[in-house]
Regions:
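Structural signature of nuclease core domains in nucleic-acid processing machines
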Residues: 418-509
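Phosphate-binding site recognition
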Residues: 2-440, 455-459, 463
């Protein structure tokens, strides 16, 4: 739901409460979000977190790609729960204010909130990270609870346990960018183990079950696995593979995008071609960064480079795993590929095969995952451009040779040279018989997608099974706006054991 602000909101400090940097922080960050030109109301998430407060489901890790609203979400949670501010006015009119338990939890909890990425920079090194966080949080807890003797407690979890024992107080711990060390210090095993131990001490064990009312971690990666189990196996993980009940609160969904398009008079069909593609359950999910930039710049283009450049995927797609490059080529052409996402260790170094690489690309947002078919695919035109830039920069010989063959096919198609078209498709079909079945229609569909790979420069991703009145068109290639005056739309009809005349008659009908 689009939220339209009616006045400038202000931060109100709760009387008698101490606002700290990490302990009971104020709501300034979320106020900025609510006051922004484009703000989508996602406070319905608070209804879920209120429901799991104080239950076994209170440990949450919600991972998603860059610029998918992670920080806005943790700022919202902090603003709602923190004792350090009075945000009744800020949340009035938003979705959560209509829930029966809105006031029961509003500004009622001691909240500890920190951003690990920011802390890493401030600490100066990964080795100093834990001591940096501890040296801020523990003194702030002492200031918040001077009546509790915390002088002998030098750890965050020790201080929380002591306060809980003395006063029965529980805490909400919110960690943004929890996985920075896992990503940026991928080969620093000692730093990672120290950090995982820090999180375990805070969130696992009998004492933690007493003092934690809610734990919410967010980052790009799910919690790292040790062997086959999560290092924090008491956390429920909501990811780009399966976000469960949190799906409506990840990115912008289609109804929200339609509202934005209506408000800013933007062509929704064009938005879908450029930025749709992530599927979580029954939801079409869009990258908020792209949509917000589109409303400002009014130009359909890739805004992904402002989030993470194609250089970040080069080392991944160049790994020497059987079938990896073939899978990338297939997905570039518009096809999807089967992927086993269950063995990935949730880090940046433990790759056993191409499935692990593809799973990481899903978590990074470069690929989408269809849980029903267990297949991965390139989401939309924006991401396809990033892959094209990556493969062009690296000069893939296989891709260059394949594109040359594909360009011959495309030119022959434009020139209506049926003989050359048949020869090129037969040649490409023969090359892929080792990985797909030769004779059925699905196999031929895959071959055609790959064969027309060069079309991605001039056409959007081919639309399969497009409704056309009587029946469906097997493939439709729609030219991009820049090329609509130069190249025709391509309509492909597949027939088994029938001639071209039959297909043409069906198209005409």
């Amino acid at each position: 739901m689009l939220y339209k602000k009616t006045e400038t909101l202000s931060i109100i400090r709760r009387e008698g409460e101490i606002m700290g940097m990490f302990v009971n922080p104020n709501a300034a960050a979320f106020q900025c979000a609510v006051n922004s030109e484009v703000y989508i109301d996602k406070t319905g998430l608070l209804e879920y977190t209120n429901k799991v407060l104080g239950t076994n489901a209170r440990f949450i890790c919600n991972s998603r790609p860059r610029r998918f609203g992670k920080s806005v979400t943790v700022d919202m949670l902090t603003a709602y729960y923190s004792k350090g501010c009075d945000t009744e006015k800020m949340f009035s009119g938003l979705e959560i204010s209509r829930c029966p338990d809105f006031y029961e939890h509003l500004n009622k909890y001691d909240v500890i909130h920190f951003d690990v990425q920011w802390c890493c920079i401030s600490a100066g090194s990964s080795e100093n990270l834990i001591s940096y966080i501890t040296n801020i949080v523990v003194p702030e807890l002492r200031e918040t609870y001077p009546e509790v003797n915390l002088e002998e407690n030098s750890t965050i979890y020790g201080a929380m346990a002591r306060i809980n024992t003395a006063l029965g107080k529980q805490f909400i711990v919110i960690i943004d960018e929890w996985d920075v060390l896992i990503r940026d210090e991928a080969h620093n095993q000692a730093a990672q183990e120290m950090y995982i131990d820090f999180l375990r001490n805070m969130f696992k064990g009998i004492e933690a079950s007493k003092y934690i009312a809610l734990a919410y971690l967010t980052g790009i990666l799910p919690i790292k696995k040790l062997k086959t189990q999560s290092a924090l196996n008491n956390f429920t993980q909501f990811t780009m593979l399966n976000a469960g009940p949190l799906t409506p609160y990840i990115g912008f969904n289609e109804d929200e995008v339609i509202d934005l398009c209506d408000k800013y008079e933007i062509d929704f069909a064009e938005v879908r071609r450029w930025y749709d593609g992530y599927r979580l359950g029954d939801y079409h999910v869009y990258n908020p960064n792209a949509l917000v930039n589109l409303t400002i710049m009014r130009t359909f283009q890739s805004y992904w480079s402002q989030t993470g450049t194609y250089l970040s995927i080069l080392p991944l797609i160049n790994m020497d795993f059987d079938g990896l490059r073939t899978s990338i080529i297939e997905m570039l052409s518009g096809s999807s590929v089967e992927v086993n996402v269950n063995e990935f260790q949730n880090d940046m170094v433990s790759f056993a095969d191409k499935d692990d690489v593809l799973t990481l690309l899903i978590h990074l947002g470069y690929l989408a995952y269809d849980q029903r078919t267990q297949r991965a695919y390139i989401t939309n035109e924006e991401i396809r451009q990033e892959f094209r830039a990556a493969t062009k920069r690296n000069k893939w010989n296989e891709l260059i040779e394949f594109q040359q063959e594909s360009e011959k096919l495309l030119e022959a198609t434009w020139e209506m040279d049926a003989e050359t078209v048949a020869e090129q498709i037969e040649k490409i079909h023969a090359e892929y018989t080792s990985v797909i079945q030769y004779n059925n229609e699905n196999s031929l569909s895959s071959v055609l997608s790959i064969a027309y790979l060069s079309a991605i420069k001039y056409y959007f991703k081919p639309i399969r099974e497009l409704p056309t009145g009587r029946g469906f068109a097997d493939f439709v290639f729609i030219p991009k706006p820049l090329y609509r005056d130069y190249y025709p739309a391509l309509l492909v009809e597949l027939k088994w054991n029938k001639d071209a005349e039959t297909a043409l008659n069906q198209i005409k009908e």
